[in-house]
Amino acid sequence: MTKRIPLPEPVARIYKATAELEALYPGRKFTPDGHLVGSIGEVIAAEALGLTLYPMSQPGHDAFDANGDVQIKLTAGKSIAMYACCVRLVVLRVVSPEEAEIVYDGAGQPAWDAAGAMQKNGQRAISLSKLRAIAAASFTA
C-alpha cells in the first residue's frame, strides 16, 4: 500500500489553480516545475518522514536523518530524472491538488542502476513504475 501525504494548504492552492487554468484554457498545460516543485517536494518529505533539510542547492542530497543522506524528487508525471546516484532516494507523486503519495523510499543505487542512459543534459530518467517494481522486490527480498 502506498503512503499518502496531505499537501499543505498553500501547496494545494497552487495545484488547484493549475487545474482551474487548464479547465479555462483547454489544450494548455500549467505544470509547476523547476525549483518550485523541488522545494515543495523537499518540505513535504521532510515533514512526513522526519528529515532535516540541507541548505538550498546542496549537491547530491536534499536532506538527512539518523540513517544518512536523502535525495528527494517530486513529480506529477510518470518519471523522474537523476543527475547522480544517491544514498537514499525518496520519490513523491502529486495524485490530486490535496495529496501526494510516496512512490519510492529506498536505496538510491538500485534506482540509479535501473535508470535509462545518460541524456545530453546529464540526467538519467527512471519511470515511477520501475521504481515501484524495485520497491516491491526489495520489500519481498
Model-derived segments and spans:
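Nucleic-acid endonuclease domains
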Residues: 1-67, 73-141
